[in-house]
């Protein structure tokens, strides 16, 4: 009743690749082309939480994907969602999700929230090993890759992040559940 289900994961190794020359467009009897040569400008990790109910995306980017960045992300979720709700996080079995510092913060957060609202704040639900396909946020990552990242040419990490933010801002205008 007072719960929000969020399908969470991180997309690591989002590469800022700058193509060395533009591809040729589609034409009669010609498929679209693209060069395989590129300049690599670095990578980022995109942390995302997809609301199971309405398709809204909570997100944050980071240079790495350790337990520290994961903890920053779930703290971000805690601040971005209404107090009084229990957040049910659907996540995979990646070690960063089970790190002692993450568990310690979750325990503290749940104790504090329980005192104020009578319910835990965050409950982790782990998908079975090798079953990441069960987590709906993976479908979102596929769409992001196909629609925004794969064919893009990015001159910097900032350019890649701006492109992802533009894509997500447009998507947020009419979010949809999967």
Predicted regions and their residues:
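Mobile genetic element proteins and their domesticated derivatives, centered on retroelements
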Residues: 7-9, 49, 55, 74, ...
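Active-site proximal helix-loop segment of RNase H-like, two-metal nucleases, encompassing DDE(D)
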Residues: 57, 137-156, 170-172
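Acidic/histidine-rich, metal-coordinating catalytic segments
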Residues: 85-98, 127
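RNase H-like polynucleotidyl transferase catalytic core
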Residues: 33-38, 109-136, 152-154
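RNase H-like two-metal-ion nuclease catalytic core shared by retroviral integrases
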Residues: 44, 92, 119-146, 158
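Charged, gly/pro-enriched flexible loop segments at helix/strand junctions
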Residues: 172-178
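Short, basic/hydrophobic alpha-helical segments
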Residues: 68-88
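Extended, low-complexity cationic-aromatic segments
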Residues: 1-75
């Amino acid at each position: 009743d007072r719960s929000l289900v969020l399908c969470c994961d991180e997309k690591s190794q989002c590469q800022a690749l700058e193509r060395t020359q533009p591809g040729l467009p589609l034409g009669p009897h010609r498929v679209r082309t693209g060069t395989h040569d590129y300049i690599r400008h670095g990578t980022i990790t995109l942390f995302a939480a997809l609301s199971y109910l309405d398709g809204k995306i909570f997100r944050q980017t980071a240079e790495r994907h350790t337990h520290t960045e994961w903890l920053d992300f779930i703290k971000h979720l805690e601040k971005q969602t209404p107090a009084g709700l229990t957040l049910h996080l659907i996540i995979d079995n990646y070690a960063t999700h089970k790190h002692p510092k993450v568990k310690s913060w979750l325990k503290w957060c749940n104790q504090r929230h329980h005192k104020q609202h009578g319910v835990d704040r965050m409950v982790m639900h782990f998908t079975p090993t090798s079953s990441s396909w069960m987590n709906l946020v993976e479908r979102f990552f596929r769409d992001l890759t196909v629609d925004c990242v794969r064919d893009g040419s990015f001159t910097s990490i900032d350019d890649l992040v701006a492109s992802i933010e533009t894509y997500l801002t447009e998507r947020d205008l009419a979010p949809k559940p999967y």
